[in-house]
Amino acid sequence: MGGVMSYFRGLFGAREMRILILGLDGAGKTTILYRLQVGEVVTTIPTIGFNVEQVEYKNLKFQVWDLGGQTSIRPYWRCYYANTDAIIYVVDSADRDRVGISRQELATMLQEDELQGAVLAVLANKQDIAGCLTETEVYKALGLDALRNRTIQIFKTSASKGEGLDPAMDWLANQLQQKK
């Protein structure tokens, strides 16, 4: 049966992979989305609701959902969990005061049944800001070492400078191709 599905997928093309970009407000989610889509920084405003764009990366098509991260919007994230292949969780590495809140939101999200099979890429963003948490500090602060039975990787990034996004997307694309 799997061979037949692979044959038809080859004939008609693979489906778009669904990726959610999540994280607290101000973490850089929208900047990352448009950096991936158009290759440059665009002026953004706080996302009230969501942005959804198609992103092509190394011959793969992704439907990328950037969900607002404000306190009032986070409870609605779960409305978008169905059929999610991967999560890009963005952390503002320069916002030491809210890393605990980010940890709580991540832990709550990862308990959802609909996300059990989703690959997780954590982006320790804003690495270009002096005094920010290092990649290792973000990893520990989020409690990622305690996660079991989940495909996960953390990357240090600067969305505004475009640094670290290619390694993250390479890893994500590779993981998603292996899951197909």
UniProtKB/Swiss-Prot annotation:
Record flagged with keyword S-adenosyl-L-methionine: no
SUPFAM superfamilies for this protein: P-loop containing nucleoside triphosphate hydrolases
Annotated GO CC locations: cytoplasm; Golgi apparatus
One annotated GO biological process: vesicle-mediated transport
Naturally occurring in which organism (per UniProt): Caenorhabditis elegans
Protein name: ADP-ribosylation factor-like protein 1
Positions that bind GTP: 23-30, 66-70, 125-128
Alphabetically ordered keywords of this record: Cytoplasm, ER-Golgi transport, Golgi apparatus, GTP-binding, Lipoprotein, Myristate, Nucleotide-binding, Protein transport, Transport
